[in-house]
Regions:
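Alpha-helical transmembrane segments in inner-membrane proteins
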Residues: 1-240
């Protein structure tokens, strides 16, 4: 009962903080608008200031919130799979694999610049698959996966550094993809992210119980009739998506 109350209180505090930060972000810049003015401009009567804020700031703020939620959930799931509270996508080599793909496309096929996010995603998938392949010895031991991921991450990071030296000024385009930013994002970008993020978050909800089980010893999980390696592969696949 106490645990449920704590969760409710934590949820309410977090929700209130999110609303406050949203309002602060909306009013960060040369244009200012009170919450009352924003609500009135959105639902009652046209307001040029509110319309500008809605077109420029709203999509960026919502993209940042949605991306943050997706990254947070994937991070928690990765920590559950790896049984390590310090685990992150960098350990799995996902981030560096995606960055390496972005660098290669920008360097050798600049005409495909608009498709760089797609290639970055494929690079992350490739890196994750490489970690699976190199760490597989009849099963997926979290320790082997982490050690292999560190090695793969170091390898791709080294290649990215070499690419940066070779590309010079042209590297900035790839870096913007690798590092991520919300500059010049529009409602179209938000709609695109919304589809993938919501699908991933909904699937994550159904996998919460599986992630809790992965905290047990593998032998215990097997005794429950659960194929632990299959569950790990499913959760890890969702994480890098």
């Amino acid at each position: 009962m106490i645990s449920i109350k704590r969760k409710i209180i934590s949820f309410l505090i977090t929700g209130a903080a999110l609303i406050v930060l949203f309002l602060v972000a909306v009013n960060t810049g040369s244009l200012k608008a009170s919450p009352e003015q924003i609500l009135r401009g959105l639902f009652v009567v046209y307001d040029e200031t509110v319309a500008t804020i809605y077109s420029l700031r709203f999509p960026r703020i919502l993209i940042a919130m949605l991306a943050g939620a997706a990254v947070a959930v994937s991070g928690v799931m990765l920590q559950a799979v790896m049984k390590n509270p310090l685990a992150d996508p960098g350990i799995m080599g996902i981030s560096s694999g995606a960055g390496m793909a972005a660098v290669l496309v920008t360097a050798f096929a600049p005409s495909l610049y608009l498709a760089v996010p797609v290639f970055a995603f494929l690079g992350g998938v490739f890196a994750c698959g490489l970690v699976y392949l190199l760490s597989w010895e009849g099963d997926l031991s979290p320790l082997r996966v982490i050690l292999t991921g560190v090695a793969v991450n170091a390898f791709f990071t080294g290649l990215m550094s070499a690419g940066e030296s070779m590309m010079g000024a042209n590297y900035s385009g790839a870096a913007s993809i690798v590092n991520g930013n919300i500059t010049m994002k529009t409602w179209e970008d938000f709609r695109m992210l919304f589809i993938y993020a919501v699908i991933g978050l909904v699937l994550a909800v159904f996998l919460v119980s599986k992630c809790d089980i992965l905290g047990l010893e593998d032998q215990t999980i097997h005794s429950l009739g659960i194929r632990v390696n299959v569950v790990r592969l499913i959760v890890l696949s969702l994480i890098h998506i």
